[in-house]
Amino acid sequence: MKKKLLCIALAFVFTVGLGLTAQAEDLALPAPSCILMEKDTGQILYEENAHEKLRPASVTKIMTLLLVMEALDNGSIGWDDTVTTSAAAAAKGGSQIYLEENEQLPLREMLKSVVVSSANDCACALAEHVAGSEAAFVSRMNDRAAELGMTDTHFVNCTGLDDGPDADTH
């Protein structure tokens, strides 16, 4: 009799939840947009305002750093290069390490300053070192973004500083 009751109780416990469905809580993220993608399949798992145009801010520096690292990888620049700060780089606002015009730093130190301090003056100086001018570097940024399938992205500078109505990406 005890075995029958135990079997009935266990059957009840294990089957009661079968008819229930799980529902995830609505996410309340403190971000204006987001997207979550499964890396192997590319399936979008969650998105909110994923195609809304937003100011890229310092996320732009990820592309800047990618191009600098690719230039290092292909040998067009070297870790031991000395980078000279132009007037344009020294005049960048926002986050910076306050470089002065014609100030020279090792490429390695400039790169660290971009990564650690989000230094706009260093990002600009590196862009000029890689491509000759910030404008030429930004053209490379947009070409690379297209190669990566970033079809809704348009860079206007190497820093992400707000340069007017065309400075957007998503």
Q: What is the predicted function of each stretch?
A:
Residues 1-2, 37:
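Intrinsically disordered, low-complexity sequence elements enriched in Ser/Thr/Gly/Pro
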Residues 2-24:
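Sec-dependent N-terminal signal peptides of Gram-positive bacterial secreted proteins and lipoproteins
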Residues 22-170:
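Active-site-adjacent loops and short helices of periplasmic peptidoglycan-processing enzymes
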